[in-house]
């Protein structure tokens, strides 16, 4: 089957055990290790939820690395890294960077919501907790108060800029993006983004909802007009763009996490077992703070028979 197609959870649940059982019996030790390059926003999701459950259910050991999705896809496309599995926070970006040369299919398995997390004891945090609209409070905040991700390294960064653009329209504040600039400071990684909030270096950060949950920080989700969580607003999101250093224009789109097993994977069977495990355990993914709507999982490209049957 090619193109975009929904795949029922029943299909995954019905055969997940068979695939995991088969690969668990055949692979042990180093051969059972699965190298995963994953979006940085999934660090706690994988380490605290998915990895322990998957390793308990199989003889496989995950070897995850976490990077911004733009960075990890570049590491694969330029031959620097050769993982078994890639997981991106932007499904379209994964297809654009990996299809044809490195992968033939991608499974979309989760969504997320953009917003702002904050430290309640800070001046900005107190205003947010009191109900001041985030954008008014942010404009008034002291310089370098709000941490944001680097748009050149991961989708969280360029979605943040797109959200500011869409928020300007939503709130009839045409200069909002420029007005927010003094209060924001760009961080090179998603892990540092929240580490600096937790240590008090910054009062807030623009993040995905699961990241705030991971760090036990209050979270204010942006409205549907610019939280990139409402598929029915896809055309509206697409009106916001970000242009990369190489001139590629990226349009806003709903947040969708996608994964694939690379064509040159060293452990193809293990990688497929892990992908199936993700798709077959939506409640586990939800417990980690992500969303799994009824429209997921779905896929692009021709799924391997082992995943589709």
From Swiss-Prot:
PROSITE patterns: TAT
Pfam families: SBP_bac_11 (PF13531)
Organism: Halobacterium salinarum (strain ATCC 700922 / JCM 11081 / NRC-1) (Halobacterium halobium)
Protein name: Uncharacterized solute-binding protein VNG_1595C
Keyword Flavoprotein: no
Domain of life: Archaea
GO biological process, one term: molybdate ion transport
Keywords tagged on the record: Signal
Signal peptide: 1-32
PTM info: Predicted to be exported by the Tat system. The position of the signal peptide cleavage has not been experimentally proven.
């Amino acid at each position: 089957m090619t193109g975009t197609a929904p795949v029922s959870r029943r299909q995954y649940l019905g055969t997940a055990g068979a695939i995991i059982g088969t690969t668990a019996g055949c692979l042990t030790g180093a051969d059972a290790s699965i190298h995963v390059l994953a979006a940085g926003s999934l660090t706690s999701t994988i380490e605290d939820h998915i990895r322990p459950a998957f390793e308990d259910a199989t003889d496989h050991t995950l070897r995850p690395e976490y990077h911004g999705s733009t960075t990890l896809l570049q590491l694969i496309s330029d031959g620097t890294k050769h993982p078994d599995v890639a997981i991106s926070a932007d499904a379209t970006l994964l297809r654009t960077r990996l299809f044809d040369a490195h992968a033939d299919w991608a499974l979309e398995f989760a969504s997320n919501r953009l917003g702002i997390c904050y430290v309640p004891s800070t001046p900005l945090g107190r205003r947010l907790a009191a109900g001041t609209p985030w954008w008014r409070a942010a404009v008034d905040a002291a310089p370098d108060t709000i941490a944001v991700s680097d748009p050149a390294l991961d989708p969280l960064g360029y979605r943040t800029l797109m959200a500011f653009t869409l928020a300007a329209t939503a709130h009839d504040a045409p200069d909002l993006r420029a007005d927010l600039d003094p209060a924001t400071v760009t961080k090179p990684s998603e892990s540092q983004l929240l580490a600096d909030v937790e240590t008090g270096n910054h009062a807030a950060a623009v993040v995905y909802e699961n990241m705030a949950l991971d760090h036990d920080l209050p979270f204010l989700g942006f409205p549907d007009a610019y939280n990139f969580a409402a598929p029915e607003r896809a055309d509206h999101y697409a009106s916001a763009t970000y242009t990369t250093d190489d001139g590629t224009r990226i349009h806003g789109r709903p947040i969708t996490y996608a994964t694939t097993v690379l064509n040159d994977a060293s452990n193809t069977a293990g990688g497929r077992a892990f992908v199936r495990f993700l798709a077959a355990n939506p409640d586990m993914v939800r417990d980690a703070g992500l969303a799994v709507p009824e429209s997921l999982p779905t896929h692009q490209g021709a799924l391997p028979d082992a995943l589709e049957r």
